[in-house]
Amino acid sequence: TKDIKALIDVGISYTKIKKALKEIDVNISEITHVFITHEHSDHIKGLKMLLKHHSPKVYLTEGTNSYLKLENANIIKALEKVVISDLSVLPIPLSHDAKEAVGFVFEKENKSICYITDTGYIISELISLLENHTLYYLESNYDPFTLLHSKRPYHLKKRIIDEKGHLSNEESAYYFSILKGDKTKYLIHSHISEECNTLKKIKETFDTVLRVQGEGTEFKRYYALPNESTELIIL
């Protein structure tokens, strides 16, 4: 927004974040806020170095901070809205094998972002809070057939499929089909497994589920890939 430049998670190195921000003409020193979903390394890898060089305000749950032990953290609670300048932030409780994982709904005026990743399912009672947002950043972690036939050990397969694991393409597509609304303009597929998923499988699954559910595809689709930046999206 005009007053806030924020990062959601810091899962890559400080150097890579600095480079990616430079591509959109943002200096890393301009980052004012950081929102952390949970403590797993692929979400906090660059946080220590970021805080060594800069002083953004960090928002995270008490459970997550019990692991990170940040002294000046801003503790947030699931389903308790935080208003920061011109931005409203609602932490959403998720089901993941972490201390206290959350997603987020960010709102400013009539534009909103729903950020949901690293969860085994979405709590049904919260669906109404997640409906009809402008942009969805939604986990499409794995294709079930590919995962089950992969060389990954059984315990890892079980962890991923578990209710505290990750969303499959089918699960993600189903949730999106019931969440999207007339305000929805963008979908970013995220947390995509390099070993157990493909962009083709994601697209085919989503197209099929949306067709069966009688939903259209009048939105722009992007894929968040590990070593690539998506194009800049202005809501």
Summary of predicted features, one role per range:
Residues 7-11, 31-39, 59-62, 114-117, ...:
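Active-site neighborhood of phospho(di)ester-bond hydrolases with catalytic His/Asp-centered motifs
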Residues 124-224:
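Cap/insert and terminal regions of metallo-dependent hydrolase folds
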Residues 4, 13-60, 134:
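Active-site metal-binding motif and surrounding structural segment of the metallo-beta-lactamase
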Residues 45-54, 65, 197-204:
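Metal-dependent catalytic neighborhoods of phosphoester/phosphodiester hydrolases
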Residues 60-111:
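Metallo-beta-lactamase
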Residues 219-235:
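Short, basic/aromatic-enriched C-terminal tail that caps enzymatic domains
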Residues 1-24, 102-118, 135:
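Conserved beta-strand hairpin/beta-sheet module of binuclear metal-dependent hydrolase folds
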Residues 40-44, 66-67, 98-99, 122-124, ...:
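Active-site environment of divalent metal-dependent phosphoester hydrolases
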